[in-house]
Amino acid sequence: MKITVLCIGRRGQEDYASAVQTYTDRLQGSYKLSWVLLASCALEPTKAKQIESDAIRAKLKPNDTTWLLDERGQQISSPELSSKLQTLKNTGISRLVIIIGGAYGVDDSLRNSVTWQWSLSKLVFPHQMVRLILAEQLYRADQIDRGSAYHHA
């Protein structure tokens, strides 16, 4: 299954980018994980959300399953994430798109159109850290599915 992460922002600090790449490489046997960075907009919040959301929508395909990382989304455990991904894999979807909006999030139209809204935590993190946490959690979910000792909670 292909997983594409659409992120608003820039590449960022090398140490974060390197760690994200490490988890991305580790996942390649199970998922084809790719990261697409889209430019952020330095306008007032409402206009920035609209322009950034339009850029995200332009990258979506009609049959994509879409998850939005959003502080108002549902929080789940790592084993629940593993199960959710396995269910998608078993249903034969071609591509899961995980969306990380800009500093002000995404517009309501995009938020309301996604398949699922997911919150990594009640805490707010910098975008680069969100990418790293997401990459690690996708890897952890895969390891849970494989019965690996990586996850031992």
Segments (PLM) and residue ranges:
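Structured adenosyl-cofactor binding patch, chiefly the S-adenosyl-L-methionine
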Residues: 108-152
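A mid-sequence interfacial segment
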Residues: 86-124
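N-terminal beta1-alpha1 ligand-phosphate binding loop
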Residues: 1-27
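Short glycine-rich anion-binding loops that position phosphate/pyrophosphate groups of nucleotides
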Residues: 11, 71-74, 102-105
